[in-house]
Amino acid sequence: MSRKKIKNPLIKRIPKEIIGDWKKYLVVFLFLVLTIGFVSGMYVANDSMLTSADEGVSKYKQEDGHFELKDKADSELVTAIESGEVKTAPDEKDSDSSKTPVTLYENFYRNEDEDYDADGKKDGTIRVYTKTGDINLACLIEGSFPQNENEIAVDRMHADNVGMKVGDTIKVSGKEFKVSGLIAYVNYSTLHEKKTDMMFDAIKFDVAMVTKEGFDRLDKSIHYTYAWKYEDEPADDIEQKEKSDDFLEAMVSQVMAAGNEVEDYTPRYSNPAINF
């Protein structure tokens, strides 16, 4: 005589449980769907932002680093620095550092007083660059790039924080400029005035672009900053650090031999305005 197969009691119980308390299970289901959707969306958005940032490095010609000299370098010194070779005295043995050839670009600026509400009082510091197509380009977010000596394009983040808009008139060290556009420089993801600053300041510090004629209107001292790009792009942060150390030794030796002085040295990997 064959045994009677015992049915699993859960077959009937589970559907009854769900139907009897469907509101609770609906809430749990919706919670899981929304959570999974939210987390997945964050990952997709993060990947998209990282891709855009990586593309921006090449599209807007981001520097591999920059240094500042006390005096403007002549063409002979520029060529010597670009060679990446360490300058040694005749009686000294050659350095052990590797030759690190680079291309240099002038990236001069002035730190001026900003009066964004034109009330005659200083509201902060504005770092003014000339319009260039060689290195550290700016993305135009609104308006237009400056076209004449009386126009200026300012950082979009700073403008949003202080209520500045396209068409406003601001004063830069007492001289009036019309805001032609809002921009974002590729080397200023955040508004760090100095590499030693622990936190950026998007209210008291601004970066801006003017024409060459507009730059000549200003009076504060020029910072002779040179941005560089390696001829052979480093594969990772470790190689970037090694190249930076070798280039620093070579650059300093050439600058000292020319009777000039290094005021600042900031490779890209240690620049908080880029990597914050």
Residue ranges of model-derived segments:
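Membrane transport/envelope proteins' first extracytoplasmic loop
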Residues: 2-276
